[in-house]
């Protein structure tokens, strides 16, 4: 409880005229919206004392119950090696970055790429690198989805994706080590890329299911498209046939037709099929 100050809101209380302090504000908000015991309470490393200790003391005194089951205290974020500051011109909000055209999934990736107990140095260059990673994940997913429709491979092999998923789960269970889990995910995607041409239809379907499962964990929105539209596949078949007979004028028109539907053609290497990939939505500043 803070003593009243001039030109500030205040109320009468047994402790004199004043207002709630920010420690009690947080306890009150938690109890109102999350209940008397919070599953996970996060905050910056600078809030351990006195803020979080005060939250615990006053909340548990009021309810007689544990205030939070798990605490996650994150290191502070650096931008280009320095603390964020408006005066230095290195202060970014999420909306700022989105309005500059940066992929929201790339931003998400960068923020998840370092363990929360370690300091992250955020740079615009890291966003570009993260965008390339997201692009590789997208490409692999749509390669699998396309090949199921195109190749019809019945006698190929399968990958042990269950082992990778178990490793990822183990990393997440180790103090929420998302950075390690991401590294395992990327390694698995590289293995899928190596074996793509030799996977059976069942193996490809398992890869698609693996991506869907990883999307539920990491939220990169890779598998939001679960099926390639028939008209896109039909146009792709016409595109492939035009390329076979070296009718490049027609193939260019068909490529543009696919692009107008929000997809892009990915030409395969010699002996490999051409596939399609859904373009990501460009954030326009609206929800």
State the predicted function of each range.
Residues 1-145:
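Alpha-helical recognition segments enriched in aromatics with Gly/Pro capping
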Residues 90-287:
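Structural preference for alpha-helix termini/caps and helix-kink/transition segments
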């Amino acid at each position: 409880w803070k003593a009243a100050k001039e030109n500030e809101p205040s109320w009468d209380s047994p402790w004199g005229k004043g207002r709630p302090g920010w420690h009690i504000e947080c306890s009150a908000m938690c109890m109102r919206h999350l209940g008397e015991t919070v599953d996970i309470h996060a905050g910056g490393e600078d809030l351990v004392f006195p803020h979080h200790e005060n939250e615990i003391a006053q909340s548990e005194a009021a309810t007689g119950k544990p205030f939070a089951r798990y605490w996650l205290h994150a290191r502070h974020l650096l931008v280009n090696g320095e603390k964020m500051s408006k005066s230095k011109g290195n202060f970014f909000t999420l909306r700022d970055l989105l309005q500059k055209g940066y992929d929201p999934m790339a931003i998400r990736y960068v923020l998840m790429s370092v363990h929360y107990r370690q300091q992250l140095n955020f740079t615009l260059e890291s966003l570009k690198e993260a965008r390339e990673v997201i692009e590789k994940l997208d490409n692999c997913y749509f390669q699998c989805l396309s090949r199921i429709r195109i190749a019809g491979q019945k006698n190929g092999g399968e990958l042990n994706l269950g082992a990778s998923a178990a490793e990822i789960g183990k990393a997440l269970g180790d103090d929420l080590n998302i950075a390690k889990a991401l590294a395992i995910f990327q390694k698995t995607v590289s293995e899928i890329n190596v074996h793509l041409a030799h996977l059976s239809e069942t193996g490809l379907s398992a890869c698609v299911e693996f991506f869907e499962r990883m999307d539920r964990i990491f939220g990169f929105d890779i598998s939001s498209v679960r099926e390639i539209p028939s008209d896109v596949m039909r146009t792709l078949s016409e595109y492939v046939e035009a390329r076979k007979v070296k009718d490049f004028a027609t193939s260019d028109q068909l490529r543009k037709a696919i692009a107008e539907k929000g997809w892009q053609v990915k030409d395969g290497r010699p002996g490999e099929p051409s596939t399609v990939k859904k373009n990501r939505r460009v954030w326009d500043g609206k929800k």
